[in-house]
Amino acid sequence: MSEGRNDDQIISGFEKNDLLQHKYTRTLISIIETSFAEKINIQELANRLHLNRSYMSELFSKDTGMSIKSYLTEKRMQRAAIMLQDPNRSVKNVAASCGFEDSLYFSRAFSKYFGISPQQYRRQILKNEKK
């Protein structure tokens, strides 16, 4: 009878694998949070982590329950909402600061995410601040 790995060794191997997978996700989140204002390419992210793009996307989705693109959009929209509270910043400036080269595309994405345009959002925020 050959001596193979026991159950504890196998479980330990799975735990190490899970820890490594979570490390990739944490690293990816960190990269996104520090560079979401840049034009981020998912393939470039995979290259930075030395991972296959599909595998990286699968890991991220498994750990977070959302796609990399959805997470990136969420971070950009959260930042845009904060920036739009400054009446001195143009929508075009906010768009560029959040990684959107095209302010029209940004406005459509913002409207889809929040259900109102950036201009409407700003008016609501400023109106509420005056109350």
What are these regions (language model features)?
Residues 23-24, 45, 54, 75:
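Bulky hydrophobic/aromatic packing residues
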Residues 2-13, 17-20, 26-41, 60-64, ...:
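Basic, amphipathic alpha-helical hairpins
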Residues 1, 13-14, 32, 49, ...:
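Compositionally biased, intrinsically disordered low-complexity segments
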Residues 30, 34, 39-43, 62-101, ...:
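Terminal helix-turn-helix DNA-binding modules in bacterial transcription factors
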Residues 43-52, 56, 60, 94-101, ...:
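Append "Primarily bacterial transcriptional regulators
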Residues 108-131:
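…primarily DNA-binding HTH/wHTH and HhH modules…
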